[in-house]
Design a protein with these regions (language model features):
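Secondary-structure capping and boundary motifs in well-ordered enzyme cores
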Residues: 29, 48-54, 93-96, 266
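Polybasic low-complexity intrinsically disordered regions
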Residues: 53, 62, 71, 75-78, ...
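An N-terminal domain-cap segment
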Residues: 34-54
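Contiguous, well-ordered alpha-helical segments that form the cores/surfaces of helical PPI scaffolds
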Residues: 53-64, 279
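Helix-centered, glycine/charged polyanion-binding patches within enzymatic domains
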Residues: 4-7, 211-212, 217-287
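Charged, often Cys/His-bearing segments associated with DNA-binding zinc-finger transcription factors
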Residues: 1-31, 38-39
Length: 287
């Protein structure tokens, strides 16, 4: 690729980012959200004056939309014109550090506001076609917790359980997610004990409007369960494109293996969109 072509491509990426954020600017009910969070936000009566609530909310939204760490969100806001314009800042002094953003996220989590905001964002994105609902990728990840983890009553949390993955034992919870296959945006998150099998949660992760569902071999049989969503809301049968286990492919004839490997590669390439999501999901589900 030539420098000129690379510059053109970079310009297109910047334009798309700005256009997307312009749509987000229009659809988010800012006044409603700020009023929802304000009672929980720092009053600034002691110590340093807190950053404006709207700045923090906009940073938090960017972090979730673009799957960024606390530090990366701050750096991108300083470096990206689209991000800084969206947050209404024009110098690095107006941008909080990563630790401050992390504390804000935990404040939302502890006050039960995160789920409300997430549900509203998903609904708005769907309504405007930014989440296309043509297909869903389902997946899960273990959220590790210390064995001493306790609930609000100071007792060992009964929702945290032990599970073996490969040759390693893990203790904690499991995050199950449904991701729009076209945009890569998360539309559903379910949290369970770590020992809950992936396939059990499948139907809870679907919108009911999909034409196709993708998942790894942990979801084999999802379309045959009693609680499976067989047809979408238009009556069309949903295709479950679940990856086979490698051992299943090995048992096939040479010609069958070739076709199967090609099909498995196609499924895996679609599922790859889900991998980057888990970094931010893990951050959202921890205190």
């Amino acid at each position: 690729m030539t420098i000129s072509a690379f510059s053109d491509e970079l310009a297109q990426v910047r334009t798309k980012k700005k256009e997307f954020l312009t749509q987000i600017e229009r659809i988010v009910p800012w006044k409603e959200w700020l009023a929802l969070i304000q009672p929980c936000y720092y009053k600034g009566e002691r110590g340093n004056k807190p950053y404006p609530l709207e700045t923090m909310l906009r940073l938090y939204l960017l972090q979730n939309l673009y799957d960024l760490s606390d530090e990366a969100t701050v750096a991108e806001t300083i470096d990206s014109r689209a991000f800084s314009d969206f947050c209404g800042v024009d110098s690095s002094n107006q941008v909080p550090d990563g630790d401050t953003l992390g504390r804000f996220r935990n404040l939302l989590l502890k006050n039960g506001l995160q789920e409300k905001l997430f549900a509203q964002v998903v609904a708005m994105l769907m309504e405007r076609g930014l989440i296309l609902k043509k297909g869903t990728i389902v997946d899960s990840t273990i959220i590790s917790a210390p064995s001493s983890t306790k609930n609000k009553e100071k007792k060992r949390d009964p929702d945290a359980h032990q599970v073996k993955k490969g040759n390693t034992w893990h203790f904690g919870y499991k995050a199950h997610i449904g991701v729009d296959k076209d945009s890569g945006l998360v539309h559903t998150v379910e949290a369970t004990s770590a020992n809950v099998h992936d396939v059990i949660e499948t139907s809870k992760l679907l919108t009911g409007e999909e034409k196709v569902v993708y998942g790894d071999s942990g979801y084999l049989g999802a379309g045959k369960r009693d609680d499976a969503i067989i047809r979408n809301k238009t009556g069309r049968k949903i295709k479950y494109k679940i990856n086979r286990r490698p051992s299943q492919v090995k048992k096939l004839s040479p010609s069958g293996r070739y076709a199967a490997k090609k099909a498995e590669h196609e499924k895996s390439s679609v599922r790859a969109k889900v991998e980057h999501v888990f970094g931010v999901v893990k951050k959202q589900l921890r205190f």
